[in-house]
């Protein structure tokens, strides 16, 4: 089919309705008015359209669903070594590759008719509403999330208001100054850190990367891939679960994750030549879930082994899955509907589920609950996040 907006954004205005309504943040009338305004902006901004990669929408949703379970299992992990859905953090690298691919596909041939300011405005309109909604939900729920891991009783209302404003404006907090005490860039809604890097990638694309020749872009991808591999294999962590804090290793690792994945997606969009593949969505979905669910490899004594696995996923497997997903088509009604549903929920699900994860985490820690004891609430959290 043909998308009503450009194929790159995957963030429709009805996201505001789906998740703001489920979170109870707005009244129905205000939500409908917001949706109409966003639709008007979208229609005016994109008179021309391109074919839409429905399967990539669906794969983004599959990865987002897996991330929710990855975060649910954080409540029972003692470290990265024993967490279930152990490699769920790699979904961010998959998102970055998808983002680079669809942005290159949608915008590379439009720069003669579009300014940098217009591009950045479009991206801001598409991405930022959910950043604000996530910050507001996080602020409203903050005082219900106190536990032994973080003490919320010492946080004053002015401190909370300041944190809300910073989160909503995507201004990162430095370690020691954020209100939860976990050194997160965005303590009210942790996953916002990836939007910080997403914005950085969009800015780099608008001012610099789009101007590179395909050969020069290939060099950038190669060098960034080497840097990412070195960080993963020989770095101090044995993984690339970084980018969420304003520390040296997080900034270096997060930047490498962005530079490789986003640039690789852009490069793939330039050289992409589809092949015929049947059942691409279902095959790729199983691969995404399987790759993200692999247990930690190598243990604490062989960190490099897990780093090697992370490198394989980020550098080899994910670009291949994006290629296969872009090559396939949702030819039957069931697949098409599933992909549309998953595409519709993917971004808002990712951006607003985590404040509820904080609440679940605190409940588990305060009650010293096992996963089996908390399973009904875990399921309620999952389906409550997914179902409009």
Where are these regions (language model features)?
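Membrane-helix interface linkers and caps
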Residues: 103-123, 146-156
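Membrane-interface helix-loop-helix regions
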Residues: 127-199, 227-248, 312-326
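Loop-to-transmembrane-helix entry motif
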Residues: 123, 127-131, 345-352
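Alpha-helical transmembrane segments and their helix-entry boundary regions
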Residues: 56, 118-119, 127, 194, ...
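Helical transmembrane-bundle signal
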Residues: 67, 96, 102, 135-138
């Amino acid at each position: 089919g043909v998308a009503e907006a450009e194929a790159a954004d995957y963030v429709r205005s009805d996201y505001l309705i789906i998740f703001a309504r489920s979170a109870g943040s707005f009244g129905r009338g205000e939500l409908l008015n917001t949706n109409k305004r966003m639709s008007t902006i979208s229609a005016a901004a994109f008179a021309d359209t391109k074919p839409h990669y429905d399967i990539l929408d669906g794969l983004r949703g599959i990865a987002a669903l897996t991330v929710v379970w990855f975060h649910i299992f954080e409540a029972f992990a003692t470290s990265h070594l024993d967490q279930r859905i152990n490699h769920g953090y790699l979904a961010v690298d998959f998102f970055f590759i998808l983002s680079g691919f669809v942005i290159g596909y949608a915008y590379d041939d439009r720069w003669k008719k579009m300014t940098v300011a217009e591009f950045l405005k479009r991206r801001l309109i598409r991405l930022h509403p959910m950043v604000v909604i996530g910050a507001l939900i996080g602020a409203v729920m903050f005082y219900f999330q106190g536990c032994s891991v973080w003490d919320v009783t010492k946080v004053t209302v002015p401190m909370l208001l300041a944190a809300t404003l910073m989160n909503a404006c995507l201004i990162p907090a430095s370690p020691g100054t954020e209100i939860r005490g976990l050194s997160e860039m965005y303590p009210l809604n942790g996953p916002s850190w990836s939007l910080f890097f997403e914005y950085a990638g969009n800015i780099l694309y608008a001012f610099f990367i789009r101007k590179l020749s395909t050969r020069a872009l290939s060099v950038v991808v190669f060098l960034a891939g080497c840097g990412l591999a070195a960080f993963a294999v020989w770095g101090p962590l044995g993984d690339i679960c970084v980018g969420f804090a304003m520390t040296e290793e997080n900034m270096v690792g997060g930047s490498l994750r962005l530079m490789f994945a986003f640039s690789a997606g852009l490069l793939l969009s330039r050289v992409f030549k589809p092949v015929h593949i049947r059942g691409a969505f279902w095959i790729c979905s199983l691969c995404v879930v399987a790759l993200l669910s692999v247990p930690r490899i190598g243990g604490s004594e062989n960190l490099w082994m897990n780093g090697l696995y992370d490198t394989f996923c980020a550098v080899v497997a994910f670009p291949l899955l994006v290629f296969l997903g872009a090559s396939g088509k949702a030819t039957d009604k069931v697949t098409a509907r599933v992909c549309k549903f998953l595409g519709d929920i993917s971004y808002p699900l990712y951006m607003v589920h985590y404040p509820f994860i904080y609440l679940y985490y605190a409940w588990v820690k305060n009650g010293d609950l096992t996963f089996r004891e908390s399973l009904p609430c875990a399921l309620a959290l999952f389906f409550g996040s997914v179902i409009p």
